[in-house]
């Protein structure tokens, strides 16, 4: 645990929208909004803490991606792409921090069917109905994610746990 005059120890990045639809629907406005929130939100969050973390040679960034950032599924090409970005960005942040000796720990979460407000951001009726059915059958509560975040935080300063896929045991993907 960090003590003393450290101004900022952790940054948790958890903003995202999922207005998923088939590519043929050409919802380019939704695409731009996903990039603005799902990618630029992470960039801006890290930019806000990186100077402090670098100066104090300590810190931890925890970001929420999605299983869609690990696996492709119809209707989520752009959403999945924004979540793949989070994976890539966090891994490069971890590598560069190690190379520069700044001791910034990173953790990326890949939630599956977790009951949150995210489903309310789906813009395509067919995609929304399918995801609602999936979540009704398999969804689990957000406290499962909170437990994983606590685990990542509780690790000693010299230990980095980088990636967690979290989902219902009954969910097939």
Regions found by a protein language model. Give the residues of each.
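Short, small-residue-biased leader/transition segments that mark boundaries at the very start
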Residues: 2-9
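Substrate-binding pocket helix/loop in short-chain dehydrogenase/reductase
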Residues: 22-23, 30-33
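Active-site loop immediately N-terminal to the catalytic Tyr-X3-Lys motif
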Residues: 24, 71-77
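Active-site helix of classical SDR
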Residues: 46, 82
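A short helix-coil junction within the Rossmann-fold of NAD(P)-dependent oxidoreductases
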Residues: 48-57
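Residue(s) in the substrate-gating loop at a strand-loop-helix junction
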Residues: 66
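C-terminal helical subdomain
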Residues: 104, 108-109, 127-173
């Amino acid at each position: 645990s960090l003590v003393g005059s450290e101004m900022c120890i952790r940054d948790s990045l958890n903003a995202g929208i999922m207005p998923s639809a088939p590519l043929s629907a050409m919802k380019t406005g939704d695409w731009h909004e996903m990039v603005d929130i799902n990618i630029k939100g992470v960039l801006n969050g890290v930019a806000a803490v990186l100077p402090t973390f670098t100066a104090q040679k300590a810190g931890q960034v925890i970001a929420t991606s999605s299983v869609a950032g690990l696996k492709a599924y119809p209707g989520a090409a752009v959403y999945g792409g924004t979540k793949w970005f989070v994976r890539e960005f966090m891994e490069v942040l971890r590598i560069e921090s190690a190379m520069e000796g700044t001791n910034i720990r990173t953790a990326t979460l890949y939630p599956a069917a977790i009951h949150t407000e995210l489903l309310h951001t789906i813009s395509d009726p067919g995609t929304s109905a399918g995801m609602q059915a999936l979540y009704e059958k398999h969804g689990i509560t957000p406290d499962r994610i909170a437990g994983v975040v606590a685990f990542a935080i509780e690790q000693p300063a010299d230990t980095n746990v980088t990636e967690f896929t979290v989902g219902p045991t009954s969910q097939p993907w």
